[in-house]
Every structure is written in C-alpha cells, then in structure tokens.
C-alpha cells in the first residue's frame, strides 16, 4: 500500500495549479518562520556569504520573490524533467525480504510506462571550493537579544577518506559538553548557552563550522575565543583524552541512530545516492576508531588555518569591527 501511494506520486502526479498555490503559501510561511529564527537564519547567511550565487549558496527554500513567481507549469516541467527512473533510488528498512521489495517496486513503477522514460541523469556538479583569499563577513541586522554567529572555513569533500578524522575533530571542538569550544565559551566564561560545531561534506568541497549565540556586546570576544582555540589546535593538536571522547561520541551517536528504522533507511539511501554503494555500518565504526592523534593534528593543521568566513545575525550595523578581528 505504501509503495503504491509513493510510486503514484512519483510517476503520475498531476500537479494542479491549486496544489501549487496551496504549497506556495506553506513555503512562504516556512520562509517567514526561518526569518524569525536567527539561529536558523545565520546558516543560510553563511552559505550565501561563503559560496555566493551558486546552487549551494542559495537557500533551499528559495526566496519570497522566487516562490511567489513560480507557476504551475514551472513546477510541472521540473517534475517531468527530473523525476526519471535513472535517478531513482528506493531505500527500505524493516522486516521485509529484498526480493519482495524489488517485485513490489517494479510492479508499481511499471504503471503508465514510467520505466520507459528516457532522459539524462540529473547533473550533480562539484561544489565550488571557496577561492577568495580574503576573509569575509556576512552581516544581517536584526534587533534581537542575542547575536548569532557561524564561523566556518573549507573542509573536506565527501569522497575524501579524511572525512572520518574531520568528523572526530568537529566533535572534539564543538560536539558536546566536554568539547573544547563548549568548555572555553560556556563553562569557563558563561558567554553563550548554545555552542556547537559540525562538518559538512559536499561533492567537491566541504565546510567545517562553529556556531554560538551570545550577548551582542560579547560577540567580538566570542569570535576571538573561537579563533584562539582553533589556532591552538592547529599548532598543537588535541589530547588523547579529547580525541577518544570525541570518537566515542561520534560512534555512540551513529549507533543510537540505527535504533530507528527510518534512520537506517535514510542512511542506506544516502549512501547509494552519494557513493553508489552502501558502506557497511561496522566498517564506518572501525574507520572512526582508527582516527589517530596524528590524523587529527594533520587535518587540524591543514584546515583550521584556512581563510575564515563569519556570518552574523544581530543588532549590528557595521561589519568593520569583525573584519578587523579576522584580519589579526
């Protein structure tokens, strides 16, 4: 039943003008919700500042103008052009046999001659690497009680075997209460409530970034702390205890995610789309466990000194003072 419903959406959607108008209102409300949440908005601002006018630099939700100007024909033509069998991946997790799933999917997708559709696979271009040699600051004025910042730089691409070391480095720097930045910014100085880091991998590049929300009067101090911590780790690496804690946290998070069938389904589907194969879960855990202090020192020394980009949402009208901090 579920496969029938989903396959019907994929193969036989009519996409009426009424449907588009109804969804347009929903997306506009989603944009409004994003704009009212500075901690969310700052990530889109960072992407725009870092990647500029590229596919990955533009907001996934679109803009108010682009959503308002989107016609039914635009949506329908995109659907007919992109929703093709050669780009389709079906991922299923649960108590069901693989052969039965294959038979059900083939039967469902054979309707309306969907499997006979021809077309070129969707182009997945490499993500552009930031090529500016100058640091950049993206600033969005918003009258708020807190300043929200995202400080990031170039990371590794998704096919880079160092992505496991990058994940451990990210966790050690800002992955939890024992992480270096959390301790320095929140526990020692009480400058922020929310402090975290994450690494993202794309086709041709990646991003390693750090978020903090703080009192606007303390924003420069927080930026300076981030820079000092990253500089220290780039020069000296991290302690054995920090690395082992981070590895344990990354492994634990992955294991817990596999308790849910939906998460398992998402993992194998994304693996197939991104890598063309499903990486064995135990192999992933082993790859994380193999990350050494030398790996962390090398990747930190290479990437934490990259030219930074800083995105800020808060009651600031001039980015010059932040540019001066980055230039030091």
Describe each model-derived feature in a short phrase.
Residues 1-10, 41-65, 87-93, 150-156, ...:
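M16 family metallopeptidases and their MPP-like homologs
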Residues 1-38, 76-84:
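Active-site-adjacent, His/Asp/Glu-enriched structural segments that form or flank metal-binding
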Residues 2, 101-104, 181, 222, ...:
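Hydrophobic side chains in well-ordered alpha-helices
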Residues 4-6, 46, 83, 151, ...:
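Active/ligand-binding-proximal structured segments within catalytic/core domains
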Residues 13-31, 97, 118-130, 228, ...:
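Acidic/histidine-enriched alpha-helical segments
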Residues 52, 56-61, 65, 84-85, ...:
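An aromatic/glycine/proline-enriched structural segment found at the starts
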Residues 67-77:
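Active-site glycine-rich loop that binds ribose-phosphate moieties when present
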Residues 76-80, 136-141, 194-200, 299:
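Short beta-strand/turn micro-motifs at beta-sheet edges
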